[in-house]
Swiss-Prot record:
Name of the protein: Uncharacterized protein H233R
Induction: Expressed in the late phase of the viral replicative cycle.
UniProt superkingdom: Viruses
Similarity-based family: Belongs to the asfivirus H233R family.
Record's keyword terms, sorted: Late protein
Length: 233
């Protein structure tokens, strides 16, 4: 499943039905059995996620870029079509700027058990008792779990986040380094200022430089399944 977290207001619901149908049609054209959950805002994740059968999940957001909301809506369809065309296997990457509400963590854990390959959890703005449970679920089901933290958290919170849970605690910069040392090329997709999908095959240090340059707005991330083990060991 691809979960698309939409920042649009309820006023755009009349567009969402058409959007939903279009995405379903794209999936069918490529012979994919994909269930799509359309959420109007991150606050609605808990409503949609638990009832969805998750296979592979990518949470997608767009930076503002001054584009009209309806243009972004259709830009996402183009991105989805591009994902299907290249046969990409999507990872769950929770972008730090769309951190979900506390109540959604159990649902995310449940989704990971059903097929996601890895998870990157940005350190939450507020520690809570549910997050260790989620991390334990990821580890128990042999999924790779990375906890990406701001550098300022390392001195005070590393032990809390990682203690006894088998997860890897690293800064966002360190995550970029891990990706950049992969020997195989990976493809990173991102929306340009017009909202269109572009794919760049990068290798070696180029990946690190690219991620570093786009770190402030790179909210769409896609890695090929065959490269997951190499980049997340």
């Amino acid at each position: 499943m691809i979960l698309i977290a939409s920042p649009f207001s309820l006023a755009h619901l009349e567009y969402l039905h058409t959007w939903h149908v279009t995405i379903k049609n794209i999936a069918q054209q490529h012979g994919l059995d994909i269930k799509v959950a359309i959420v109007v805002s991150t606050s609605h994740l808990n409503t949609f996620l638990p009832i969805s059968t998750a296979l592979n999940i990518e949470c997608i957001t767009f930076p503002g870029c001054g584009i009209k909301e309806i243009d972004l809506l259709w830009a996402r369809i183009k991105l989805f079509q591009h994902y299907c065309a290249i046969g990409a296997r999507l990872l769950w990457l929770v972008s730090a700027d769309i951190r979900p509400p506390v109540s959604t963590w159990p649902a995310i854990a449940d989704s990971l058990k059903k097929g996601a390959d890895a998870v990157v959890i940005p350190y939450p703005s507020r520690w809570n008792n549910l997050i260790p449970t989620v991390i334990k679920e990821i580890v128990v089901h042999q999924k790779k779990c990375l906890v990406a933290v701001d550098a300022r958290h390392l001195d005070t919170d590393t032990q809390i986040v990682g203690a006894g849970m088998g997860c890897i605690v690293l800064t966002l910069k360190a995550l970029m380094v891990r990706l950049s040392i992969g020997k195989q090329p990976i493809k990173i997709l991102w929306p340009d200022l017009h909202g269109t999908a572009e794919g760049i095959p990068l290798e070696g240090v180029e990946v690190g430089w690219f991620l570093n340059a786009y770190a402030h707005k790179l909210n769409i991330r896609c890695l090929g399944a065959e490269h997951i083990a190499q980049h997340f060991i």
